Amino acid sequence: MRMQHFIFQFLALAWVAGAALAQELPVVDEGELRELCLRGECRFDVVTSVRLADGQVQEERITQHRPAILANSLSIMLGEELQAVADFDNNQFIRWRAAERREPSRNAVLDFKLTQTESDGSISLEVRNNGREPVKLNLFTRAPGAAGAEYTSSCPVIAGGSVYEYWSRPVVEVIVGEAVLVTDDGALQCN
């Protein structure tokens, strides 16, 4: 009986640790970022304006910001649209990359659009999946002036479909970490 209890505790701990790791903000290596910026791949003079709940507009200026597409993550600033491919090998996420002009239909090509609604000021992220498989994304949101981003729940994007994520608080950037192919119908739930 004691061994069963130990195995249960071990499995529970492994499950919690796995969930926590999936919710970690992807790290951008400083050396890699420096090289990318020297090659001109970074975004320069990024200005983002977000309307706050009190009606005022807060502007954020970033002199030099990471590229929109890195192998381990995507960055979508408020007002931006982005198209990226999630590469998989044996159903395991490998990397993000820019879409090619004529991408094979079997690839998970995703379109992102981050906007603020005029009526209530909420922020919405539209994600369109042009691939053949449902995909779940690990999303993180960054508030104006914040150095880091926080994990946020998200819904899977069905094959050939779209999903909208909404936030009532100000968000200037959404960072997309790992993508996961959804192979189980039960996993098509939002979390």
Question: How does the language model describe each region?
Answer:
Residues M1-F10:
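Bacterial N-terminal signal peptides that target proteins for export
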Residues A17-A19:
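N-terminal signal peptide c-region/cleavage motif recognized by signal peptidases
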Residues G31, L36-C37, C42-D45, V85, ...:
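Low-complexity, acidic Ser/Thr/Pro/Gly-rich terminal tails and inter-domain linkers that flank the onset
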Residues Q64-F88, P144-L181:
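Intrinsically disordered, low-complexity Pro/Gly/Ser/Thr-rich segments with frequent PxxP/GP/PP motifs
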Residues E133-G148:
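Short acidic, flexible loop segments centered on an aromatic residue
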Residues L125-G131:
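Asparagine-centered strand-capping/turn motif at beta-strand->loop junctions
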Residues P26-D89:
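N-terminal targeting leaders for non-cytosolic proteins
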